[in-house]
Amino acid sequence: MGKRSPRRARIVFYDVAREQLEAMNDAELARLDLALDIIAADPQIGVQSKNGSVRTYQQDRVRVVYVPTALGTLVLVAYVEA
C-alpha cells in the first residue's frame, strides 16, 4: 500500500476576505498562497487570540486572520493582508 499524504484543511473565505483578495496584485497573491498552503497543512499553526478560536498567522509580509474548525478540516479566513 502506498503512503497517504496528510489531510489538508479546505480554505473558505468570508466576503470581506474575498474582497481583499480581489484588490491584491499577483506578487501579493503569490505570497498569500504560500501562507494559505502552510495553514491548510496545519490549521493550528497560527497564534491563538485571547478571545476564542480566532488565530493569526504572519509570514513574509502576509497576515491571515482565520478560524479553524474543531476537526481541522475547514479553515474560515476572515481577513488577509499582503
PLM segments and residue spans:
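Major-groove DNA-recognition helix of helix-turn-helix-type DNA-binding domains
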Residues: 42-45
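Enriched for short, Lys/Arg-rich terminal
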Residues: 1-11, 19-34, 38, 58-82
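Short, hydrophobic/aromatic-rich segments at coil-to-beta transitions
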Residues: 49-56
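PIN/NYN-family metal-dependent endoribonuclease catalytic core
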Residues: 14
